[in-house]
């Protein structure tokens, strides 16, 4: 919600004060859309007085244009440019008004610390090794802002519960598709239906090895590429449920 529009939190507080039927209805739809714009109606506003949905979400400085940010990025040194265009940073203004990249681990420090605590508690409660590994590594990633190890752990999941938690989709950043939005969905693996797919899943690597693609983009040998069937129990944030790791060193293999 905070990543979609800077005014969302204040608007939410205002909606919570409206106890009328219309107010309750607006609140419900606001929570579904994570903002005052209907995603099913080309982002048309359904609450009076709000601006158009910001194309850059809340990832870039207030008052900045796409051209402003683009020109700033173009003038950066390679390392700074990589940070500015990375999945896990916002762009803000420093005390002097100049643009700077801020890691998610700092931008959302309070929320991520709380989330990491919940993930560590869940890891302590499970007896499933790959699930424990993912939850622990994802908790660490929220604090360090380095998601690679936890993305690998996610792709190695072999547990009855299939969690996807973290910054994944970039469609909220309509300016550049640089910035990943946080989302979570929790699913339970359907072992009976998954078993029916094993006949095909066991051949995926064989098929990929014969495709005319560079070795660099092939699935790593230690990643399980078999398809799984899951029942989705809970979804938070987006209206879509793709959820692959955004790290360019990885690619999704789960269905």
Range-by-range predicted roles:
Residues 80-255:
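Fold-level signature of zinc-dependent metallopeptidase catalytic domains
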Residues 1-134, 138:
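N-terminal helix-rich structural modules
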